[in-house]
Structure formats: structure tokens, C-alpha cells
UniProtKB/Swiss-Prot annotation:
Record-given protein name: Protein PsbN
Key word Signal present: no
Gene designation: psbN
Signal peptide per UniProt: none
Lipid bilayer topology: Single-pass membrane protein
Top-rank lineage group of the source organism: Eukaryota
Key words of the record: Chloroplast, Membrane, Plastid, Thylakoid, Transmembrane, Transmembrane helix
Transmembrane segments: 6-26
Length: 44
């Protein structure tokens, strides 16, 4: 019983780290060049 809780914790930790890493890659990596900036589109 204690062993399965440990593996669930490790799985959730790895999932959190991978989602965070992917978000940083999309936000600041090479794919960020394709993102649009709504503030630059509507400048007065």
C-alpha cells in the first residue's frame, strides 16, 4: 500500500515537471516565433 502511494507521487511529480518544461519550451524556445502578440496587433 505504501509502495503504490510512492509511485503515484513520483508519477505526478514527473508529470508536473514535464508539463512545466514543455510550457517553457513553447513560450521561449523556437516555436515561440509562431506565437502572436495581441498587444502588438492593436497598438494605437
Amino acid at each position: 500500500m505504501e509502495n503504490s502511494a510512492f509511485f503515484y507521487g513520483v508519477f505526478l511529480w514527473c508529470l508536473l515537471i514535464s508539463v512545466t518544461g514543455y510550457s517553457i519550451y513553447i513560450g521561449f524556445g523556437p516555436p515561440s516565433k509562431e506565437l502572436r502578440d495581441p498587444f502588438e496587433e492593436h497598438e494605437d
